[in-house]
Amino acid sequence: MTELKFVFGDPRICSGCTTCSNTCSMFYYKVISPSRARNRVLRIEPALDFPLFCRNCEDAPCIDACPEQALMRTSKGIVIVNNKKCVGHGECVKACPYYAIRIHPDTGKAFKCIQCGECVERCPADAIFMTTEKDLAERDKDGSMRALYEQHRDEIYDKEEDSP
C-alpha cells in the first residue's frame, strides 16, 4: 500500500498569520472564521505557532472512539465524518492524538481537515505542505520539530480544551 500523504504545518516556520484557517473557512463556508476552519493554528505565547491538521493515522483512534460509527476512511485513506451519523458526542475529539478534530460551532457535529490542500497553496511562509510520515521524519532529521511538539504538548492540549 502506498504511504498516505497528509497536510502538515511546521511550527518552526509558521508565522501565525492564520492564512490557512482563513482560507479553509472561506473555501468551505464562504466566511473568514477560524472557528469554522477544518484546520487551526494554536499560539503558545509569546510567539510559537502550531498549525494543526489531521494526519489520517493508519490506526486512527478517532474511528474506534465514535459510538455512532460516524467516522470512516475513504478509498483514498482519508478519514471523514459522516454528518448523517454524527451526533456530536465528541469522543473522536478526545481520541485524536493530534488535536485535529473538533465540534463545529454551528452544527454541533465533528469536523476535520479532509486534505483538500487549499491551505498548502496559500501559506505565505511555506510552513504547510503535503507529506508522508517517512518524508516528515526526513525533514525533521535533527528532531527539533518533534521536540517542539513534545515540549508544548500540555499547552497545546489546554488550548484545545478552550477552543470551540
Label every model-predicted segment.
Residues 20-31:
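Core segments of cupin and vicinal oxygen chelate
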Residues 1-5, 30-38, 42-64, 83-164:
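Flanking helices and flexible, charged tails adjoining ferredoxin-like Fe-S electron-transfer domains
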Residues 17-21, 124:
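Conserved long hydrophobic alpha-helices within structured protein cores
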Residues 13, 25-27, 46-47:
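N-terminal pre-ligand scaffold of iron-sulfur
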